[in-house]
């Protein structure tokens, strides 16, 4: 991130840190750029990521990811992938890790979204935890599949935790998605 600040004049600021729970939690994070993948390591406490298992086979990157003890899933696995997130997510939470989930399942171009996957919310419900929605405008400065970076300040906004206990999982997901996408609209650079 330091190199991006110096070479590309691309800085960032985080808003809403007061919303971070005191204990390990599940974060639902907007995925629109490669930037947030790098930045989340500095922004959030000790963490593990739910990611596509193919990334583990990329030389050097896979080795680095292995150190984070990721929950590497086969995205085509459906229910099996959800079970992996539940089982491994519970274990990582017990070890004190925060579980980072990109609920769209892949990077989405700015202005686009898709139905959020359920595994993050189901894990939160299984552990009686809230989900923490997080959005940012990095996609405006470092677009998906783009190497050119625009100078500016990326804004990361951490939202209030969303309770999951006693709430229909789909309703929690819809609320998180609505907060993430609506807040993102307010972050468009001028």
Predicted regions and their residues:
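Generic preference for hydrophobic
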Residues: 14, 27, 49-50, 156-158
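Catalytic core of membrane glycerolipid acyltransferases/transacylases, capturing the structured
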Residues: 5-7, 22-78
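N-terminal membrane-anchoring alpha-helices
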Residues: 1-13
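A generic structural signal for well-ordered alpha-helical segments
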Residues: 4-5, 65, 92, 124
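Secondary-structure boundary/capping positions in well-ordered alpha/beta enzyme cores
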Residues: 10-11, 46-47, 71, 96, ...
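Glycine-rich helix-loop-beta junction characteristic of Rossmann-like nucleotide cofactor-binding loops
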Residues: 16-20
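Thr-Gly-centered strand-to-loop micro-motif
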Residues: 15, 51-52, 73-75, 103, ...
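Non-catalytic C-terminal accessory region of glycerolipid acyltransferases
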Residues: 82-190
